[in-house]
Swiss-Prot record:
Keyword annotations from UniProtKB, A to Z: Aminopeptidase, Cytoplasm, Hydrolase, Manganese, Metal-binding, Protease
Active site: K284, R358
Protein's cellular compartments: Cytoplasm
Chief site of localization: cytoplasm
Protein name as catalogued: Probable cytosol aminopeptidase
HAMAP family per record: Cytosol_peptidase_M17
InterPro entries cross-referenced by the UniProt entry: Leucine_aapep/pepB, Macro_dom-like, Peptidase_M17_C, Peptidase_M17_leu_NH2_pept, Peptidase_M17_N
Role played: Presumably involved in the processing and regular turnover of intracellular proteins. Catalyzes the removal of unsubstituted N-terminal amino acids from various peptides.
Listed GO CC annotations: cytoplasm
């Protein structure tokens, strides 16, 4: 998608659809005057309340290539960044559904929006562009089109070809800068969604490594891939144990972005890369197993966030670590009751082979501390269904041994719209993962499942004082039938970038 920023009045821009944003207050006060000035031939009905993400379609008398369709987009109270992101997302969905290619947003009131939301115009421009890219996203690369009926081919959604931010006036330079950032962040988040949406037969651990290499080429940072031989040499027993039932080899990917100047901090991001999770010998139920292609969401988010950080030129060193494999049953697969030795030397009793993510993360967390000793370690993983039970599908679980880090991640969640909620890491939970035959057990029984998983991971950070674990099992992937686009969400990319920008 091309993005154009112009000082030209929005009503004079060549476009298929023109968007006017209104808060609830502005809808009552200004809508009549604004719409009359555009030549809109009818007013919205009383059902349109300008709630955040609510839209209404109107028409106007237009000449030439000016937009005849006008969308009213509600931003609710207009007090948060998320109000504007929701509105832009809804507008993009509607534009794609109408098979229209050029979308124009009226940005002339951006100073008022900035005052209401306490955001800078540059930040709001980025948010609007991110929202449009998110709403316009479609995953259809695996469709051949051969079964489409001739008469329905014209009805296939067409993605937005150009986004125009119009009426920018004296804020042109700031909006251009913000739009550029929004294009980077939105594109990287959508690449993460592409990876997560790929089924297991299209995305192996080696394919995921190749995607990281391509991200490195685009972002200009170094990517190193360890093959199975190197993983064996390093003694990554957790990753190797999970991979035992697979015919596909594992990989361990290192992404290393270094800024041009001196880095203010070194941040390690660890992403779970289980490309398909059958549960292994502890086989999952058939219903919903197809969605387990999304069990590498943490890896996709880490790859995308580092590419975005590099493209934005953030003054931080950001190291990404991605242990990758699928988790399959088979004659050589690990079994419940097995005892494995991880890279750290800590032995683990495997009570359930479907608690595999923590095994591969154990090696990656230890490697991060041992090789880089970073200022901060953050891991992201679709780790536990228990987190969904606790927090639902919209919020991620947050665990940290550092109060200040936890607070920073929470605030980044609020600003990015990718919200997290902190859960405890109290010592009492250690009792639940004790083993009679090994140093630690990989499951903790029925209760507090998301907490015991985090407590397990904590044992592999080798005493690091600034670590956080984010369980994204709920918000990483949306099932069909919801109000959002089904499939991968890319949850975590904006969260990490807001956090990294805060440290910049």
């Amino acid at each position: 998608m091309k993005c154009t920023v112009t000082a030209k009045e929005s009503g004079l821009v060549n476009a298929d659809i023109l968007v006017q944003f209104f808060s609830k207050k502005e809808m009552k006060r200004d809508a009549g005057k604004v719409l009359a000035g555009l030549g809109v031939v009818a007013s919205p009905d009383g059902d349109f309340k300008a709630s955040a993400g609510e839209i209404a379609m109107l028409y106007r008398q237009a000449s030439g290539k000016e937009a005849s369709r006008v969308i009213l987009a509600g931003v609710g109270e207009g007090k948060t960044a998320e109000d504007y992101r929701k509105a832009a997302d809804s507008v993009a969905r509607k534009t794609v559904d109408l098979h229209l290619g050029v979308l124009a947003l009226d940005c002339s009131p951006i100073d008022d929006w900035a005052k209401q939301s306490k955001q800078k115009p540059e930040e709001l421009a980025a948010i609007l562009v991110e929202g449009v890219l998110s709403g316009a996203y479609r995953f259809d690369r695996l469709k051949s089109g051969k079964l489409d009926k001739e008469e329905t081919k014209e009805d296939k959604p067409k993605n937005i070809e150009e986004l125009v931010l119009a009426g920018c006036g004296s804020r042109l330079e700031a909006i251009e800068k913000g739009a550029g950032k929004g294009m980077i962040i939105g594109a990287c988040q959508n690449r993460a969604r592409d990876l997560v949406n790929l089924p297991g037969n299209h995305l192996s651990a080696e394919d995921l490594a190749e995607a990281a290499i391509e991200a490195g080429k685009r972002g200009g940072f170094e990517v190193t891939v360890f093959d199975k031989k190197k993983i064996v040499e390093l003694g990554m027993g957790g990753l190797l144990a999970v991979n035992k039932g697979s015919e596909q080899p594992p990989t361990f990917v290192i992404l290393d972005y270094k800024p041009k100047g001196k880095a203010k901090k070194t941040i390690a991001l660890v992403g779970k890369g289980v490309t398909f999770d059958s549960g292994g010998i502890s086989l999952k139920p058939a219903q919903g197993m197809d969605e387990m292609k999304s069990d590498m969401s943490g890896a996709a988010v880490v790859i995308a966030a580092i590419e975005a950080a590099a493209s934005l030129g953030l003054p931080l060193r950001v190291v990404g670590l991605v242990p990758a494999t699928d988790n399959m049953p088979g004659g050589s697969a690990q079994k419940p009751g097995d005892v494995i030795t991880t890279m750290s030397g800590i032995t683990v009793e495997v009570g359930n082979t479907d608690a595999e993510g923590r095994l591969i993360l154990a090696d990656a967390l230890f490697y991060a501390k041992k090789e880089y000793n970073p200022d901060v370690i953050i891991d992201l993983a679709t780790l536990t269904g228990a987190c969904i039970v606790a927090l639902g599908n919209s919020v991620a679980g947050l665990f940290s041994n550092d109060e200040k880090l936890a607070e920073s991640i929470f605030e980044a969640g609020q600003s990015s719209g990718e919200k997290v909620w902190r859960l405890p890491l109290w010592d009492e939970y250690d009792e639940l993962i004790k083993s009679d035959v090994a140093d630690v057990h990989n499951t903790g029984g029925r209760g507090a499942g998301t907490i015991t998983a985090a407590k397990f991971l904590e044992k592999f950070i080798d005493g690091h004082k600034h670590w956080a674990h984010i369980d994204i099992a709920g918000p990483a992937f949306w099932a069909k039938g919801g109000s959002k686009t089904p499939g991968a969400t890319g949850f975590g990319v904006r969260l990490l970038l807001d956090l990294l920008k805060g440290w910049s």
